[in-house]
Amino acid sequence: ATSNGLFNFYLRSKNRVALCAIDECQDWFKTVVGYKSTSSAPSMKRLLQCYDGSHWYENKGNTNKRTGVPSAALALTCFTQPAAFLRMVMPKLVSNSNGLLDRFLLCLPLIKSATISERIEASRKLKETNLTSLDKLYERIYAKHNSSDKVMYSLEEEALDIYVRHNQSNLSSDSSEGNAKNDKNIIRLAAILHVFFNVLEQALDQRVQEISAKISAQTMTAAIALAGYFEKQRAILKQVCIPNSLKLDFS
């Protein structure tokens, strides 16, 4: 996920969203936040712009010819060891106060390893279903949304009402910091959950049909709850990076 790599992807793909997954991402983020002098990774400013799908134009070559795209959006999934990330990267993201951290959905789940007997039982149950892998699901989702035609989803009236009431409740509370970004994240999570569970249900029922264009109230309620979980996780992890705050054991 280098800056040049992303830019060239946008030039080739024309208005498609870049999907990136980075394992052990602490080193990549060290470049983003300025620990390393190399300029291979996108800057924090560029990541902020990619969150909103802003334009990206650059002057290339000796002729300074201006080239680029009107919209460059990035969906980024990162995995890391928490100790290194919280020690080296998180303090930089917190101190910059540029809003980049609030655009990420952060979580540090508790470790839970399944026993051998639990895995055997899960494998047995999986073989009894019509779906033994998520690969086909993701392939269908990709094919559906990687065409030249834009796919539009909207909220059912009840779902919109739930979303508006949640937003108004947040505005009247004392913890309104970052609400605008969290509201965007709720909409994005609602769309993700809507598409995934629609395709999952069809796969389990062994049927293929168009994905509903309307996001339900049930899905919106789930998206609000999930966004709230990520928001609380982010707040806790921010506190860990404040001097003299509670230190957690990640060993």
Spans of model-derived segments:
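Phosphate-handling catalytic cores of nucleic-acid transaction enzymes
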Residues: 1-251
